[in-house]
Regions:
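N-terminal pre-first-transmembrane soluble regions of secretory-pathway and organelle membrane proteins
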Residues: 1-69
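Acidic, Ser/Thr/Pro-rich low-complexity intrinsically disordered segments
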Residues: 52-124, 131-135, 145
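Exposed, flexible binding/inhibitory loops of compact, secreted disulfide-stabilized domains
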Residues: 177-230
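Short, charged, low-hydrophobicity "junction" segments
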Residues: 41-52, 82, 178-186
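Soluble periplasmic/extracytoplasmic beta-strand elements of cell-envelope proteins
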Residues: 72-74, 93-95, 141, 153, ...
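C-terminal edge strands of extracellular/lumenal beta-sandwich accessory domains
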Residues: 22-32, 61, 90-101, 129-177, ...
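A residue-level signal for beta-strand positions that form part of recognition/binding surfaces
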Residues: 17, 137, 228
Length: 231
């Protein structure tokens, strides 16, 4: 009987998900999507927390998806004051910009309460959205109307996911076989000084092309050939 009980306990414990949403805490330094962290695989589930101390503050992040994958987004608040007392037009505005540059403002379509046991916390869903993704980097911008704290979720895959710091040379290990530089890694160089980004690309063994340049800001295209550098 003891052996059977232990077996039952083991089975039940294995039914519990191995991962909850992985957290990302945005700060004032993440004042735009281009200055925010980059989720390498947008299918992986992350909860992104934004805390605003006054109106008209902006925080943002990015996530990479491949064509045909699903962009999944949730907007939540903790079920307590002041957030659960705010009118919809006083809550932070969430805007998603797709790789083609099309912007979409998330509309609040529900007010569904639920209990999240991992944090022993009650939340309220205000929006849940999904669509078939384009290939490239999605940018998420959150802008406050008043002092408020919110959480948004991207992705549904409950497994470990990688997050890159903005404008930072990534810790990239060259894989065996044909090398494909993921868009998220190239995106990580956006915002770096030209010389620093070129040095990073050289250190990692990348070939690159500057697609545009604005003072010290520029973006990389998918053409990484060294003989295709434009000034």
């Amino acid at each position: 009987m003891a052996g059977l009980l232990l077996a039952m306990m083991f089975t039940i414990s294995n039914l519990t998900p191995a991962y909850a949403h992985q957290p990302i805490n945005l700060t004032a330094t993440n004042s735009s999507a281009d200055k925010g962290p980059i989720i390498v695989d947008g299918k992986v589930s992350f909860v992104i927390r934004a805390n605003f101390s006054k109106p008209n503050q902006t925080q943002g992040f990015r996530a990479a998806l491949q064509a045909g994958e699903t962009l999944y987004f949730e907007y939540l608040i903790i079920d307590k004051a002041p957030e659960n007392k705010l009118a919809k037009n006083k809550l932070p505005v969430a805007t998603i910009t797709d790789p083609a540059g099309k912007k979409m403002v998330i509309k609040f379509t529900e007010r569904t309460k639920f209990y999240y046991p991992f944090l022993d916390t009650n939340f309220v869903y205000l929006a849940r959205y999904n669509q078939t993704a384009l290939d490239g980097i999605y940018k998420f911008t959150l802008q406050s109307k008043v002092k408020a704290a919110i959480q948004v979720v991207v992705g549904t895959l409950e497994t470990y996911g990688e997050v890159l710091s903005p404008a930072t040379c990534p810790a990239w290990v060259k894989p065996s076989g044909e090398v494909k530089i993921l868009p998220a890694y190239a995106e990580g160089l956006v915002g770096m000084k030209k010389e620093a980004a070129a040095s990073c690309a050289e250190k990692l063994g990348w070939q690159y092309r500057i697609g545009q340049e604005d003072n010290q800001m520029f973006a990389l295209t998918r053409d990484y050939r060294l003989d295709r550098i434009n000034d």
